[in-house]
């Protein structure tokens, strides 16, 4: 059977991908690629540079393969390469950084991995950046990996989205496989556990379900907060937990909140979850965020100027996913436009307004007064002392950023100041922050404290 002409095939692939993918994704990554040839059941796709090749390999090769299969009626192998003369080109022109010339997606997975268990090859201890925000969680995870079923059982990792809970859990799994290749390591989300349970009930195979999970040497359960309201799932998990714990097997659980804050969680489960160690993970501080970016750039074989690292770390503070996403966005932007890796070139693509949060004026006033070692009364006064006036201007700026209050209402919160005073203060700080990196860092730190202050006040 003759294969379809390559131009015709690629034209159809583009038509379907244009519908399936978002416009920015299609324009940036798919439209710039081209199909070179189709032979021996292998489609060769050419990309303009190594970064584009790696990006397609990492995120879109499966999508492309599925579309090609739907057109040809049979599966084909997809091989993505770089146009001749581009393989070793430094993108950016300034020689300030390099892109990897090796394909990062071809990491060899652990050959001892159970077929029902999926661990990310990048989630290992050596790639985890330790800081004040996660030191205890890291130490506890390493201790569990070295001696499972002993001191911290269960280990309950608690923290917000994108802070490294899943990384630590899977690092435990990888470590155990290195030490004991025949270990039965089960990593499962709470949703998957529930789905497996439903399937077992439907197929009348509850015994197999129980034997499967209770055979684990290490059970890693992610997002346990989603067990909320699932009474039968809680019942089965309780007995699975008991069986493993009594047998000296290790259980590691991750959640975005402590056990006692998971609604409708059975009291006996809450008690079991709390009987080991609850290790909290907070948002990383500036130094840790910079270290994370540095380590990621080293693994990707990219040289980043220190001021770029500091700029990204200062402006993206919520979690690690946001931080790494900003770096990825920066690399894509620089690659596409062929620009040097500088703060000035990255500023347009990394613009991120400060997060609007449900902060009360009182919470903001409290943080500002505490930071500048003055009183709230000083902030509301008519004092023109330099330190008080400066603190007041920053407070007005942050209140504008973190609330929906109008300029007149903000003026009222600061002791009845005129709205023109508030407008002047906000404009002044906004202009200064564009060139004053120290001020930008101060504002981010104050914003982080305001967020924590506001969350702690929620019922």
Curated annotation (Swiss-Prot):
Gene3D superfamilies: 1.10.1750.10, 1.10.8.60, 3.30.300.180, P-loop containing nucleotide triphosphate hydrolases. HAMAP family: DnaA_bact. Domain I is involved in oligomerization and binding regulators, domain II is flexibile and of varying length in different bacteria, domain III forms the AAA+ region, while domain IV binds dsDNA. Residues 74-117 are annotated as: Domain II. It is found in: Cytoplasm. GO terms for cellular component: cytoplasm; plasma membrane. It comes from the Bacteria. Coiled coil: none annotated. The gene is dnaA. Residues 335-459 are annotated as: Domain IV, binds dsDNA. Pfam families: Bac_DnaA, Bac_DnaA_C, DnaA_N. Belongs to the DnaA family. This is Chromosomal replication initiator protein DnaA.
